[in-house]
Each structure stands twice: as structure tokens, then as C-alpha cells.
Amino acid sequence: MNQEDPKKFGLYIHVPFCSRRCDYCSFATWTDREHLIDQYLTACKTQAATWTPELPVITSIFIGGGTPNLVPAELLMDVVADLPIATDSEFTVECNPDLVSSDQLETYVHAGVNRISLGVQSMVPHVLASLGREHDPTNVQSAVKKIRSAGISNINFDLIYGAQGETNEDWQTSLEKALSLEPNHLSTYALTVEPGTPLATDIERHPDDDDQADKYIQANRLLTGAGYSNYEISNWAQPDKESRHNLLYWNQGEYLGLGVAAHSHIGQKRFWSVRTPERFISAISKNSSVEAGSEQLDVEGWALEGRQLALRTSSGVPEEFIPHEVRHLTQPADLDGNLKLTAEGRLLANEVAVRLR
């Protein structure tokens, strides 16, 4: 049974187009497929239409990528135009700060977008260069101003730590400059080496585990001190500004994914789509399935997964499921009898998760 409120249902749309592929990126994205944008978004709309009769009211939408604000805003918003969306839904579009424009935002707002997630990554130029990012950190402030002027007050910053050459002082600078712009939510991710990426073959740029651990603690100290709650390992939010869409994932809620490589979870079945735009467009045009694979957890596996996900959040896990040998990584049980990881314990969350009963 879903832990999340059954009345909540999410929608994810994947936009696999980028002007440049970041060195650490392993997502389904392409820099040489812009000629397919119109066909792709039309295919996404067709895919959405096939699901519409079965869909409950959608309470959260997240459009990610890739670079969603690289594609024409009108075409992107048309994908969701006929879907049953709640009037109080959380509707997020992921954006590259360099590409944010007032006209684009006006179209988003007209379609119901009320949250923007900016791919900031760092506020220090040489760190961005190390990550293979191309945007100018000074454009973040300009983007935030445009977003707020358009009437969107709910803003998230994505940040990455652990790049080659990033000192603790650089990370502090990124955090402080980010906080000065007063986002409602920050997601901070340790740089991860994924197979097949340029970063994977460049050993000198691989992150150091101890350095990343120090930077996580540094971020937690600064962000919690600034009034943000660490409600999930990598996420901090101002009061009542937690990402409702992300909470749906962590609480095993249901959602539909549209587009290439998009994952869905309906009932207790998870399934995902083909990975390339060409295969996706072709399958949709032939009225064929775009499903590339699926899985279905049994009752025991479902319950264990729920506890492993809850361990990542501020909800915690009932005390009886956490072995004594790892309880030194948790805070004292709360009034509900749940144990929550300490900041240091969150660094070892994966190790604790595999020991859950």
C-alpha cells in the first residue's frame, strides 16, 4: 500500500535536449537532436493523451532534462494543456540560468507553472569550468529577478560539490552567494562519477570521499543555520517549501513519466521508456508501446523499500527496524518511536539502509 496520500499523483516529463553535455552527466540527453524537438514534444503530447482517461487529478508536475527551457515554451506547455491538473498543483520546470527569459516565463506562468528549479551547480567560475558547465554564475541573479518579476516566488537551486579544485572556501562562497538570493529550496549533490562520462575517464578530476563528507557537513551547518530544514539527505527547504513532487517519490507515491527514459510508478508496478528520441518518436507514431522494462515488488520488498526511502528523510524509521550496531548514527527516538539519522549518519545512509530489517 502506498505510504503517500492516494489522492496525490505526480507527472514527470523528460526533455532530452541540451546545448552542451556536462562532463559528469549520464542522463538521457543529446546535444545534436534539436531538429527533433517539435516531433518529440508532439509525441509526448500524444503519449499523454493515451493516458488521460485513466489519470487521477495531477497534484505535482516536474519537467526535467536535459534543458527544458532550451525548447520553445509554447510547445512544451502544450504537452500538459489537456491533462487533469489540480488548481493547487506544484508545477516545476528545470531551467538553465543563462536561458531564462521573460517571454518564456510568461508562457510558463500562463500554463500554471509556479516553481522553477535552477541548475546553478556552483557560484564560482573555475568550479563551473571543472564541471564542464558553460553558464555564467553572474546570470543566476538576473534569472532569479526575472523569475520573481514573472510572479513565480518558489525557486530551487541545484548545487554540486566535490569538483576538482573546489576548496572549502569555494564551497562556502557558493552557498553564501546562493543564500543571498533567498531561494526557497536548495538541493546539494555530491559529484558522482558515472560510467561512460568524460569525468569517468579523467581520473585526476575524480572527487575525494573525505572532502565530499566535509562539504556535506559544511552545507548542512550553514543551511540549517539559515533556517532551512534538511528534510531529505540532499535537500533543504524553508518552512512549507519542501518539494511536493520529490516527496511523492520518497513516499512511494504514484506518478507517470512522459518521454524518453522516463520512469513511472502506478499501482505497485514500475516501468520505464525507451532511451532515444528516435525510438520514442517512432514508437508513438506507430501507436506502439514505448515501455523498455518494468518491475513489480512483492509485499515484503515493497515494505523494505519504504523503510529505506524513509531513512533518507526527516520522517525516520521505526526503531525496531534499525539494528543496534548502527544506532550510533541516529538521533534519539522521537515521540512516534522513529529513529532519524544524524548529519554524520546521513553520510552513511546507504550502508545503514542495507542493514534495515
For every predicted segment, state its role.
Residues 14-29:
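Local cysteine-cluster metal-coordination motifs and their immediate loop/turn environment
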Residues 1-5:
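A short beta-strand-turn-helix
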Residues 321-331:
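Short amphipathic alpha-helical interaction segments
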Residues 15, 95, 341-342:
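Hydrophobic residues in beta-strands and at strand termini
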Residues 18, 184, 254, 337-339:
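Beta-strand-connecting loop/turn residues
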Residues 330-338:
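A short, conserved structural fragment
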Residues 344-357:
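Short, amphipathic alpha-helical interaction segments positioned at domain boundaries
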Residues 6-10, 30-51, 57-321:
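C-terminal scaffold of the Radical SAM
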